[in-house]
């Protein structure tokens, strides 16, 4: 194999391996971005986060409804017999007078009356009314509304946290799929080289230049590479299945590797930024605000509750409905908890502890995110150094293989030495693809640590 051909192959491999990291921010792969947007729309885990957000929105509407009038229909009917009574001696009081009047008038206009015994339990009595209630002063429901409004912001931050984690996972899976695909290509190239060696060794054996040892060794190497290809193809399938899983689509769907992003031979420097805009910190800030509102809500027992009500209905015996049975009733209710054996105070103290606890969690998270960013940047610099080393190693391995190949074809080199050079070249190509993917993964980790991807 000529030096010119090998150089062209090396150039093609390098061009395929190098990623346009310089275009990471403003000119990122449209194909990869399209995949990310598709995941935003289809990923099941993200859908669950949106369901929780929708639930919080409805919870806020529920809290708002507590400030509006509540109308309910209430009805009851009683049938009673026996029990306590009120005895009214109407006959004893009026009958003597009625008898005297009948004698004076010589008539019976005034009948004799019986004493009455009235049941205290109403018999055959109904009461149906519409009750309208309206809170006038109630600090608890006021705080409940503010808490649920903050909870919406908390859930929205949770959605963004999941999105950023999903972006990193998708990019990492994309690079792993790329790396697995390159491994298949590299092993296929190695197989072609071994097949060429078999052809040359067969020719040498036919011409009596060498014995069958080199040919046997070449065939054994071919079987080893075939096994490596099988393993690499399996890793590629698994990487593709995981990538499709993140996008919530058929696990065997094809994956496009945008060729326009394999143009640059330069690795860009790591982006700079801070982690003070991390949505996790926004979540903790909202949780702290909710805890503070909960504390204030627990202290709201000091303010009395005041509400009003209006009843419009009808009540009478024997299901009578007329102008006499219809009625209305309006009133004002006052509730003021004056003593509860310290329950409210202890509840307020628990809420105060929650506020302090969340503040401590915020401080810890802020420091941990700084550590995460520093670690990601250190990993990036290490990955870049490894990439540069792998790049240099590939160039040296390529030159070494070309030199050994020439000497072998001239019959001045053992096949085992040529095979060693070929394996070094294959390993160098694999190492470069691994190092390249590690650089891109490190960049994705920095992007995640800085929360810099535009959602």
PLM regions: where:
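Primarily recognizes Gram-negative and organellar outer-membrane beta-barrels
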Residues: 42, 72, 76-120, 209, ...
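Small/polar (Gly/Ser/Thr/Ala-rich) solvent-exposed segments
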Residues: 47, 70-85, 116-123, 133-161, ...
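Terminal intrinsically disordered/low-complexity segments used for targeting and assembly
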Residues: 1-38, 74, 83-115, 233-269, ...
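Transmembrane beta-barrel architecture of outer-membrane proteins
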Residues: 125-127, 172, 217, 305, ...
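Bacterial Sec-pathway N-terminal export signals of envelope proteins
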Residues: 25-85, 209, 250-292, 366, ...
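Membrane-embedded beta-strands of outer-membrane beta-barrel proteins
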Residues: 130-132, 332
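Periplasmic alpha-helical coiled-coil/stalk elements that build and connect Gram-negative outer-membrane
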Residues: 3, 34, 58-60, 157-277, ...
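Amphipathic alpha-helical coiled-coil segments
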Residues: 48-63, 162, 168-185, 203, ...
